[in-house]
Amino acid sequence: MRTFKIIGMLLSYPKQPLIDNMAEIEQVLKSEALLPTRAMKKLLKFTEYVKQSDLYELQEEYVELFDRGHAHCLHMFEHIHGEGRDRGQAMVNLIESYAERGFYMAEGELPDYLPLFLEYLSCCPAEEAIDLIGDPINVVATIGVKLKKRDSLYYILFEAMQSLAKVKADSDVIAAATAAELETQSLEELDVEWAEAEAFDNSTECGSSQVLAYPEQNSAQLSQ
């Protein structure tokens, strides 16, 4: 079930060793043949994109997409529970599930980090992994739709995950989530307009903005 792990690796912060081992990664995907034909072709399109891209540009794109803001956050429970109390219990439950399989996280990692979850699935029996990837399918599908609207090829990874699941995403949930994002973007644009207007008033104070960022996560080696 290394396909799950590979998708998680491709969804992690891009580094040179990943690019250097892309031929091996592609071979594993083909030999395991877990993905449907169409999803496989698209995933190989993504790996080719990674191979042909400048590493620093890939890293810049990754940070812009996944480390800034909420829309494409790779922590699944943030989309489901936000900062609510239920998120903590969901984390505990997931950690316990990991431990039952002898799967333990590195210090500083959060269990709902999607690449980590995919690595865990690679340790599960095939049928169980396919069932479990369906649990966050609405989150996965929503992020994929948002990335596709941004013309980012990273959407291919999210479509690949969907192709592995038995269940289908709820189109109403996806529509509601994308509509909420558009509303949020409109409010942010209004904030920018107000900030620009204040920049030309008589005030001598300068405002500052803060960006919510998530710590870089280390992907496991393919051979493990």
Where would I find each of the regions flagged by the language model?
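Charged, alpha-helix-forming regions
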Residues: 1-113, 119-224
